[in-house]
Amino acid sequence: MEMNGGYAAFFSRAGIPVVHMSYLDDVMRKLSSVAFPVKHTQYDTFQRLQDHFDPELKVHARVAQVAGELVRDLSDSLFLPFNLLDYAQLLRDLYFSLHIHMGSLGHGLDLSILDSAVQNFSAAAFAFHLRQSNLDTSDPMAIRRVNDQLLLLERAFLDPVGLPQNPYKKHIVLSPAESPAYVDEMFPGITDEFMRFLDQLGAPEDLRPHAATLHKHYHLLVQTLVQAADSLAEVVPPQATPSH
């Protein structure tokens, strides 16, 4: 998914799940970086679209049909089709990348607490889906509770303060990093501070403020992952008050 797309604010600021759809033929796949070079310019007009890209709007019609079918499928699904184990794997991959790049840098970060938080989230995701598979599907409120937890999970990854270099980006896992990273993908806030730290190595500038920001955001990241895992815990409904 294009992390800097026009819809990025939905998940990076508001924690709202999004889906990205596009059409690429064989030619456009080879030119994927310039498939629509006039996008977001003054030449991005409906007339140019008809003249050069989709004269009969056939592609737009097909994509709209796919989108409509997706909406129908979501509406008909008993549970939101979110696999939290995929999210757990993403966190594991980001941690692994961080472990590799931070291992050779004198950062003083205790990576074991992040490892523990990621493992805790993985266990919580597995337990959540296990409960989901054994749920009484005749209980509409039980289904509602599970779907609410699935839908609101993204918001558990929001930090009200935002990323260290961009307070408007609140999602500490999926927000795009500010700086172009020349390393493997890591957590966005960590990536930004890591790149700043590397850029200043060997320079006369004092690195302690950068290191302090890195440590502060790192511990906030760990705390947020723990809270996200807690949000997947079983929700016990209040007992009904017996009538007299």
Predicted features and spans:
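Secretory-pathway/membrane protein signature
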Residues: M1-H244
